[in-house]
Amino acid sequence: MTTPWRSVQISDDAAGLVDSNLILNLNEPNRLGDVSWFKPGKYAGVWWSLHLQTESWAAGDQHGATTANTRRYIDFAADNGLIGVLVEGWNRGWNGDWFGWGREFEFAGASEDFDLDTLSDYAKKKGVQLILHHETGCAVSRYERQLSDAMTLAEKHGVHAIKTGYVCDSGQIQRQDVEGGPISREWHDGQWMSNHFLRVLQEAAKHRIAINSHEPIKDTGLRRTWPNWISREGARGMEYNAWGNPKNPPSHEVNLVYTRLLSGPMDYTPGVVSLKGRGDTPIPSTLARQLALYVVIYSPIQMLADLPEHYAEHPEVMPFLRAVPTDWESSQLVAGEVGEYAVMARRDRNSSAWYVGAITDEHGRQIDLPLSFLDPKRKYRAEIYRDGDDADFRSNPFAFASETRTVTAADRLQLRIAPGGGEAIRFVPLR
């Protein structure tokens, strides 16, 4: 008899929980072999505007996934060293009531105003890849019947990552074992759906495609066995700060570190530097916090979620956003308490640079940060992006400061984090 693992993590402190690899190591080793065709990195895309309702998934005058608009995002990605551009609403089937229905989605057919051939060629010339979106809208069996054709189309156009979606009310997943036959309903986290996610991964792997699942099943470390399962959502992400009532409070992202993120990476989609949701409603965050989230919340694929024009309005954040990697050689929680704050240090896998991200809940705090994680034989240039002295997520969220210092592993930094704020630091070795 084969049974699933059930695990309990016990630690003397919060860092012991965060630094544990227990869940990952309970899974079988890599079954796919060489997956070097997937490159971790950052992406932009047609997404945030849809949640703001300034553009639409559906075709028409407000359609976001047009050839011209996608080209604009490709230019932005290329100019800022991003690897990809996500396009939601690129395919046919979004018109009408797709939520919980999804029976008109076509995953191998582009919308009339989205020229996939032209855009994939343009992206390739710019050194950028398209990231396609497969939203099922509950109609999961319909997706499975198109899966091979959909992956073949994506591979043909140089796509190496697909974001899948399962927007559907609880217990309403549509299962149809025979086309035209009766439809039964499945639970989102039931056995049939668990097997569905594996079927998608396996088909995607045949085409050298990685999967970033939204509205997923919970993470149990299967990315060790199927390393093309690069990330997933699985908790309230940034989209709730567009239209949620309530929005994600500052404590939410802190709590993710000690709960959801214990199981694996999360595509949280940070970097909304406008700090505004739908109807210009304020997002509970400071500007510096949006930078810190790239280090605190781990995912090998991270989105610069805001609109290109909003980044143009905040050039002060772009040096960090261009530099911060998503692939880490080592990571450690250097300070933190459950539900209060978290300070994460990570070393870049492709250089000797270190990064620190610190976030707090609704309360401001001062943190004494020892730099003992740095190489004791080297000096570093610390590029600090912090909350301004009078920053507060409620009253002065854009108060922001940056500075540079020379430091060693023997030094300590005094972090002053505003209520709802954060701090991001890049440590670059000096010769």
Predicted features by range, described:
Residues 200, 207-383, 387-391:
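Active-site-proximal substrate-binding groove within the catalytic cores of carbohydrate-active enzymes
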Residues 360-431:
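C-terminal beta-sandwich/jelly-roll accessory domains of carbohydrate-active enzymes
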Residues 69-89, 346, 353-362, 415-426:
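C-terminal substrate/ligand-recognition segments
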Residues 89-275:
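Aromatic- and carboxylate-enriched substrate-binding clefts and catalytic-loop regions
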Residues 15-16, 51-54, 77, 92-99, ...:
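Flexible loop/turn segments at secondary-structure boundaries
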Residues 37, 66, 70, 112, ...:
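Active-site-proximal structural scaffolding
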